[in-house]
């Protein structure tokens, strides 16, 4: 019998609103909304805004794993990782962040982590 401990969602967002990609507060709110929609428990968060025309890097540490974001406003691009354990609603991360970042195109990949584990 096999068991998958978690699913890792990789979300590349293209054509995002440049102003949103620079707005740490708005990005934090969007990630928190995504985490809450998956029914995850937020343990802590840390966000950093880079100077000049730089973007934002942020992470939510969850009891069920993490959600992180890295933005490049100059390219209108954001990269998001969402690793969620258990039966959490991973698709909600994609749904909410695509809406909140006003994207033109999204590429979503889900990787089953630990799929070779065998339970006896």
Regions found by a protein language model. Give the residues of each.
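Polybasic/polar functional segments that serve as interface/processing modules
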Residues: 1-120
């Amino acid at each position: 019998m096999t068991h998958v401990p978690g699913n890792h969602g990789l979300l590349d967002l293209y054509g995002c609103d440049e102003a949103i990609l620079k707005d740490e507060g708005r990005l934090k709110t969007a990630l928190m909304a995504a985490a809450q929609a998956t029914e995850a428990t937020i343990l802590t968060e840390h966000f950093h805004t880079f100077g000049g025309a730089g973007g934002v890097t942020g992470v939510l540490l969850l009891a069920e794993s993490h959600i992180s974001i890295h933005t490049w406003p100059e390219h209108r691009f954001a990269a998001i990782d969402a690793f969620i354990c258990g039966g959490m609603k991973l698709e909600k991360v994609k749904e909410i962040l695509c809406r909140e970042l006003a994207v033109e195109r999204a590429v979503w990949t889900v990787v089953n982590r630990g799929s070779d584990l065998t339970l006896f």
